[in-house]
Amino acid sequence: MSDIALTVSILALVAVVGLFIGNVKFRGIGLGIGGVLFGGIIVGHFVSQAGMTLSSDMLHVIQEFGLILFVYTIGIQVGPGFFASLRVSGLRLNLFAVLIVIIGGLVTAILHKLFDIPLPVVLGIFSGAVTNTPALGAGQQILRDLGTPMEMVDQMGMSYAMAYPFGICGILFTMWMLRVIFRVNVETEAQQHESSRTNGGALIKTINIRVENPNLHDLAIKDVPILNGDKIICSRLKREETLKVPSPDTIIQLGDLLHLVGQPADLHNAQLVIGQEVDTSLSTKGTDLRVERVVVTNENVLGKRIRDLHFKERYDVVISRLNRAGVELVASGDISLQFGDILNLVGRPSAIDAVANVLGNAQQKLQQVQMLPVFIGIGLGVLLGSIPVFVPGFPAALKLGLAGGPLIMALILGRIGSIGKLYWFMPPSANLALRELGIVLFLSVVGLKSGGDFVNTLVNGEGLSWIGYGALITAVPLITVGILARMLAKMNYLTMCGMLAGSMTDPPALAFANNLHPTSGAPALSYATVYPLVMFLRIITPQLLAVLFWSIG
């Protein structure tokens, strides 16, 4: 058998063994995709014992390409929500998550200096302790750029594997400990979270208001500032027994009922200007109007602003709200449409059908992947990651590398959505498949390279010490920030658990947090809020630590 055939066969065996290990669960918790790393270690141990020779060049290419696939698909997935997560609504959560990253970096630096841990080893421990595989890839690349021998670089994967198991268990232990310390009642926390969502400003709400302000009588909707802005959409108007879709030129009269869509604070302001909320239904049932959700798939409307499509004027159809990447938005006239946007339309059936034809509404297109944008994005990401940034006093130029470059490019392209007829939307199933393929390839190679010396290091070497260092890097930031968030910020416990899981980019921890109260969406919401920024920081941090430690000797 040729070296290439043998290498591919061994990698396939690693994937099978690793995925099997990852699917084994204890009380609902398993290693997940991280099991591939340990599958690689097991197979790598026996490969080393058997004296087999694998193609090192091929392994290197597969490892790097797997990493690129993984970080690129992550960026495309979270890109639409990344910049939104940095706004005020998620600012507090992101600040606490960033603090966890910073404290973790400080603990790593202190351990490195106190115990004189070799640089590749301490970076591997850091990456494993925070259960972040792209951080491992980024650290290995910067070490190679700094001229570190390959046998030392490979030690990073071994120390990563030592620290990884407690990285997963440590965050679960932290959640449990914080629950005990603060005597948390999970049911009460879930109710408080739901109440804050109802009264807060993050959700899109609807309200029916009766026009009671005499100053508004006989005015067109476009002449009422609060109704002509981008914060509130008036999607229905009921006069006596007639329900219709209002246009900007529609004249409102005293006693009219308006169905408004917007954030709670804006709807409250509308009440103060227009009149009181009423309990009367403005449902389209039994009328000649209907409400329908339509998906944007027509390449000709991508990038166009809603107001430039003139749906109100041409078709008498109102877009009441827009869902983008799972986030509900008010359908402001200035919003540019992206592939995969889901619009709520209100109007007559024939008019809605006409608008749906304009927008595309081709469900089958959502399952198709445009491969050209994928490779354009990957190529641009690799180029971005290869750009050197020279900093005075640093021994090597800083680069985003094969982990950071594709990630940042994917975040940008995911946020832009489309350029001309190229769109970077990727069906969730396709995104997940490519992401899983990438991480399996990457971890398989890392495990294979680490397997030969793993058992000896654990039994006769410093493996147990590495596990202890990793436990500190995992636990100290999580416990510190958890206590601060609860005591100082009075953060909801379920929200805090999601934030802690997101700060470690740890899906098993999110699954554990979700199981604390299966009907509450608090953990998933906070996890998604901090995940994009933290993933970026986790990839950059080992590179900064490597250059810093290298420069100060």
From Swiss-Prot:
Any one Gene Ontology cellular component term annotated for this protein: plasma membrane
Membrane recorded as keyword: yes
Chief location: membrane
SUPFAM superfamilies given in the database record: TrkA C-terminal domain-like
UniProt keyword Transport, yes or no: yes
Pfam families the UniProt entry points to: Asp-Al_Ex, TrkA_C
RCK C-terminal domain: residues covered: 191-276, 279-361
Record field: transmembrane: 4-24, 28-48, 65-85, 95-115, 158-178, 371-391, 393-413, 439-459, 464-484, 493-513, 533-553
Source domain of life: Bacteria
Membrane topology, record value: Multi-pass membrane protein
Entry similarity comment: Belongs to the AAE transporter (TC 2.A.81) family. YidE subfamily.
HAMAP family per the UniProt record, alphabetical: YidE
Record protein name field: Putative transport protein YidE
Record gene name: yidE
